[in-house]
Regions:
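Non-catalytic structural scaffold of enzyme domains
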Residues: 1-218
């Protein structure tokens, strides 16, 4: 137990997405140790901060207040004992540099992890308008204006509690449009969309949540 890794999840943006990230972290740990007998003490220690932050993604004017609140929540954690951590939200990586400073360099970037994985490929991106316009993922094939609005509404419905299975079909339509426009892979660039990905049977989807979960347990 004393040798297990201590992982920090900065989540709550939204809560369903970071709960999904926590589950994927445990599942990827199990896959990495397949064949062995895992006891409870073998799993990593995980602190999951599900932070009820204001929606600074839709309202950039709330960004500074959100950052201050997240930093205040992080002060409740003994960061010196954390081995590594990640932000369970794509768009919240707009705050990555500030939060990396707060955590003493302990965070692993989901964005950089994904970019390394897809280097050299033509990528499509379904995400929040903020993630698309920010260029966090560099050049990517994005949905048209109607598609962006549809995806944003799907994300909001996930956060409001609509079952993921009921929303997956609408997302799949937008993903297939990007494939038809030449994307080799399509990235689920919002953690709420990663939840829906479990109900979409397409072999060219990239899930950043799964990739960061694998990275932090290495």
């Amino acid at each position: 137990m004393s040798d297990s890794k201590y992982i920090l999840i900065i989540g709550g943006m939204g809560p369903q997405a970071s709960a999904f990230a926590h589950r994927r972290l445990v599942e990827e740990f199990q896959l990495a140790h397949r064949g062995g007998e895992l006891g409870n003490a073998d799993y990593p220690r995980i602190t999951h901060l599900s932070i009820n932050v204001d929606d600074f993604i839709a309202d950039p004017g709330k960004k500074l207040g959100a950052l201050n609140y997240i930093n205040a929540c992080l002060r409740d954690v003994n960061l010196k004992s954390v081995d590594c951590g990640f932000i369970a939200c794509n768009t919240a990586h707009l705050l990555f540099d500030d939060l990396q400073q707060t955590t003493g360099g302990r965070l692993i970037s989901m964005i950089e992890t994904v970019k390394e994985s897809v280097a050299g490929q033509k990528i499509g991106l379904v995400a929040t308008p903020a993630t698309i316009s920010s260029g966090l993922y560099g050049e990517a094939i994005a949905p048209d204006e109607a598609g962006v609005l549809k995806i944003e509404e799907i994300i909001r419905q996930v956060i409001s509690g609509v079952p993921a299975r009921d929303l997956a079909g609408g997302l799949q339509i937008e993903i297939e449009k990007l494939k038809n426009r030449g994307a080799e892979k399509v990235m689920l660039g919002c953690s709420e969309l990663s939840i829906l990905g479990e109900f979409i049977n397409l072999d060219y989807i990239i899930d950043p949540v799964t990739l960061i979960a694998r990275k932090v347990i290495e």
